[in-house]
From Swiss-Prot:
It is an enzyme of class 2 (transferase). GO terms for biological process: arginine biosynthetic process via ornithine; citrulline biosynthetic process; L-arginine biosynthetic process. Carbamoyl phosphate binds at residues 15, 39, 66-69, 204-207, 232. The keyword Metal-binding does not apply. The record marks 79 as: Important for structural integrity. This is Ornithine carbamoyltransferase. Keywords: Amino-acid biosynthesis, Arginine biosynthesis, Cytoplasm, Transferase. It comes from Neisseria sicca. L-ornithine binds at residues 99, 163, 167-168. Gene3D superfamilies: Aspartate/ornithine carbamoyltransferase. Belongs to the aspartate/ornithine carbamoyltransferase superfamily. OTCase family. It comes from the Bacteria. GO terms for molecular function: amino acid binding; ornithine carbamoyltransferase activity.
């Protein structure tokens, strides 16, 4: 939209990390482009690209973090909360091991926000990420709560976030395990009401399995009897 020249390299169009090292790919692309956005799996890949490219490298998504989504989420929360971010509280409920929960935890800590994670303890962010976030929050005045009680997590918040329970590339067999673990962490009207805030708002990075209008949504309904998964 801004008139830039953009090239999209889909996975099958690049030999990065396969027939060509990440370092070599970074050096070549860095000579051809003014910036690189990487959207893939390993955090170590985008960090190595940034180390050798010689141009700005943007993390469009990895398994561990989703910083560009955080820019959008921070802007959205600022626009719709009616108060400064350091006076805003939000919760993330669901599978908290991956990029969205990790990134929201770090984002909230850096911005001095009140951050709650509601998830089974086995699905919490790694101890390393939690420790880093707590250290940052001590400097910014942020608050961090990790709990296995979804209603405790959402009490008094301005926003409730969630994400899919089974990520792209995971086998269908993962659904049964996640549903068993996370059925009490679905974002439902009742959970929204449990916040005690009539103005609470729901956020999801999308796509969301919230009804039967997709092939996956219909399969989940036929297999598990759920009309919507992480959110209804």
């Amino acid at each position: 939209d801004q008139g830039a020249g953009v090239t999209y390299l889909e996975p099958s169009a690049s030999q990065i990390g396969h027939k060509e090292s990440i370092k070599d790919t970074a050096r070549v692309l860095g000579r051809m482009y003014d910036g690189i956005e990487y959207r893939g799996f390993g955090q170590e890949v985008v960090e190595e690209l940034a180390k050798y490219a010689g141009v700005p490298v943007f993390n469009g998504l990895t398994n561990e973090f989703h910083p560009t989504q955080m820019l959008a989420d921070a802007l959205t929360m600022r626009e719709h909360s009616g108060k400064p971010l350091n006076q805003t509280a939000f919760a993330y409920v669901g599978d908290a091991r991956y990029n969205m929960a990790n990134s929201l935890l770090v984002l909230g800590a850096k911005l001095g926000m009140d951050v709650r994670i509601g998830a089974p303890k086995t699905l919490w962010p790694s101890e390393n990420i939690v420790a880093r976030a707590r250290a940052v929050a001590e400097e910014t005045g942020g608050k961090i709560l990790l709990t296995e009680n979804a209603e405790e997590a959402v009490k008094g918040v301005d926003f409730i976030h969630t994400d899919v329970w089974v990520s792209m590339g995971e086998p269908k067999e993962a659904w049964q395990e996640r549903i068993d673990l996370l059925k009490d962490y679905r974002v439902t009207p009742e959970l929204m009401e449990a916040s005690g805030n009539p103005q609470v708002k729901f956020m999801h990075c999308l796509p969301a399995f919230h009804n039967r209008e997709t092939k996956v949504g219909e399969w989940i309904y036929e297999t598990f009897g759920l009309n919507g998964v992480e959110v209804t």
